[in-house]
Amino acid sequence: PNYQRSDGLKAARLLKAGGLQLDPWQMDIMDDWLGLTPAGKWASTTCGGSVPRQNGKTLLLQSRATAGMLLYGEEVIYTAHLQKTATETFEELREFFEHPKIIKHVKEVKTALGREQIILKNGARIKFLARTRNGGRGQHGDLLIIDEAQEIDENAQASFLPAISASLNPQTIYTGTPP
């Protein structure tokens, strides 16, 4: 994408404070995903990535979500094909937010199955949802993450995309594993 500046380095510093380190290829993608126009809007409102299993895709998504929450106060909707995957991602991200240098930003963590959320003091939040035909109804946010995008169907996509339509600076990220 063509962007004037990127907050990728800010995001990397933030992650490092919480004990996470991005690989160079992840940093390149993060720079693109966090690329901004002169007006401060996302240079890419729809992004994607196809990453083989066990190569750092989840860390990349967690990093983008974390940057959105801490740097921009975003409301994030993370979706996965299965609730098991959504819950596993929640557990990993909760661990990051429990880091001694990061926990001061946390207001509340909700752990009820299927309703997991991390809410920050700045108003940012992330919800972890399984994609269902009606799973996106009534949701709202700024960043929509479609993990396991190779498994999404038209009904689930139609359910979730309106969730970010009211955002002043929406972004949708599709990632998956090659077949």
Roles of regions detected by a PLM:
Residues P1-P179:
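Phosphate/NTP-binding elements of NTP-utilizing enzymes
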